[in-house]
Amino acid sequence: MAKKGATLLVKLVSSEGTGYFYVKKRDPKKLVQKLSFRKYDPVARKHVLFKEEKLR
């Protein structure tokens, strides 16, 4: 069987300050900078920027 990759789970936290977050897998070898996505925040009811934070 193949080994599992070195993917990390990271938390994408809303920049709106609502506390809403998404969890995403990320390969540390391919990406050096932090992830940021524009996704829907249902608490704010609009699309906002989500930035990467460590998942505990």
Swiss-Prot record:
A GO term for molecular function: structural constituent of ribosome
Coiled-coil region list: none
Top-level lineage group: Bacteria
A Gene Ontology BP annotation from the UniProt entry: translation
Keyword Phosphoprotein in record: no
Sequence similarity: Belongs to the bacterial ribosomal protein bL33 family.
Protein name according to UniProt: Large ribosomal subunit protein bL33
Source organism of the structure: Anaplasma phagocytophilum (strain HZ)
